[in-house]
Amino acid sequence: MAMRRFDPRQAQRGPQIRINQRIRVPEIRVIGDDGEMLGIMQTHEALRRAQEKGLDLVEVNPKADPPVCKILDFGKYKYDEKKKAREAKRKQSVVEIKEIKLRPKTDDHDLEFKTRAAHRFLGAGHKVKFTVRFRGREITHPEKAQEQLDWIVQHCEEIANVEVRPMMEQRTMTLMMAPKPAILQKVAQARAAAEKARQKAIQEGRAAPAQDDTEDEEIEKLERELEEQDDEDDDEAEATE
């Protein structure tokens, strides 16, 4: 059976998790996909078993001697880990700071997209830090960055307050905005209502309502899109230098 389609490079954005052929040690302790301890075996043999089931061989404890690996669906594993992280985040009710990067040359279309993203983050109860990075002679025209940040403030002032006004630090101009108290109250009420419904279901012996991950998924999607755009901007800037 051919190796599963998962591309190991997908794991590189987070902690380095070794899977499949990236597990280089000759011998490992293996846990089956059903949780059964299969004992110590040669890595190539464990990989063969994973392939036969159409699954991945994933290193779950690299510090053990020998390292512990588990046969599982890595795509599902990553999804479950994200879900656990979201759950922990909900319980902590921590206000995150989302960063949005700009350039003096950011065009109107991209500026509007990034402002909409900021509006979404602020509406979800997060603070937003805007950074405008200057390259080369761009630093001689800081007024362009100031205009961009003023435009952003104007379009977000309905739901957010300026926490730190635009300021220059070396070759970067920054602005920090925070959700207005009414927005934070609305977010807190929604979380409290969801938790109350969950606790009530548990007390009545019913299955707890599934958590609605739509908002978290939208936020994550926006962050990925912003990251991709930042990479494109960096490539373009390096090409023109």
Curated annotation (Swiss-Prot):
InterPro entries: T_IF-3_C_sf, T_IF-3_N_sf, Translation_initiation_fac3_CS, Translation_initiation_fac_3, Translation_initiation_fac_3_C, Translation_initiation_fac_3_N. The keyword Cytoplasm applies. GO terms for biological process: ribosome disassembly. One of its GO terms (cellular component) is cytosol. One of its GO terms (molecular function) is ribosome binding. Residues 212-241 have a biased composition (Acidic residues). Its main location: cytoplasm. It is found in: Cytoplasm. PROSITE patterns: IF3. The keyword Protein biosynthesis applies. It comes from the Bacteria. Belongs to the IF-3 family. Monomer. IF-3 binds to the 30S ribosomal subunit and shifts the equilibrium between 70S ribosomes and their 50S and 30S subunits in favor of the free subunits, thus enhancing the availability of 30S subunits on which protein synthesis initiation begins. This is Translation initiation factor IF-3. It comes from Sorangium cellulosum (strain So ce56).
